[in-house]
Amino acid sequence: MSRILSHAKKNYRKAIVIESLLLVVFYLLIYGWQRQSAVDFSYGFLSAFLPFCTFIFIIFYRKQNFSTKLTALYRAEAIKFILTMVFIIIAIKWLFVINFIAFFVGFLLALVLNNIIPLILNKI
C-alpha cells in the first residue's frame, strides 16, 4: 500500500509543478493582451489552485494512521471547500476583481487541471 501512496504522492507533486508552470505561462500570455485580465485570471486560478495544494498537503504530507486516512480525506475536502470560498470572497471583495469572466475562466481552468493532470500522469 505504501508503494501506491508514494507513487500517488509523486504524481501529485508533479501535477502541482506542472500547474504552477501553466499558471505562469497563461498569465504571461494574457498579460500581453490585457494586464488587468491577467491579474483577474490569476486570482481565479489561485482561488482553486491553493485549496488543491492544501488538500494534497493534508492527505499526503501529514503523519496519520491508516485507519484515520478516510477521516482525513473528508476533513481535507471540507477544508478545501471552505478555503475556496474564502479565496473567492477575498478576491471579489478586497482585491477588486474587475473582469469576472477572466476570473471564472481561471477558476474553472484550475479546477479542470486539478483533475486532468493527475489522471494523465497516472496513465504515463
Curated annotation (Swiss-Prot):
The listed locations are: Cell membrane
> Whose protein is this, by species?
Haemophilus influenzae (strain ATCC 51907 / DSM 11121 / KW20 / Rd)
| Pfam families (alphabetical) | ATP-synt_I
The topology of this chain with respect to the membrane is: Multi-pass membrane protein
Where in the chain are disulfide-linked cysteines found?
none
Listed transmembrane segments:
14-34, 41-61, 85-105
> Keyword Isomerase, does the record have it?
no
Q: What is this protein called?
A: Uncharacterized protein HI_0485.1
Top-level taxon of origin:
Bacteria
Q: What is its main location?
A: membrane
Whether Transmembrane counts among this entry's keywords is: yes
Q: Name one GO cellular component term.
A: plasma membrane
Task: Could you list this entry's UniProt keywords, alphabetically sorted.
Answer: Cell membrane, Membrane, Transmembrane, Transmembrane helix
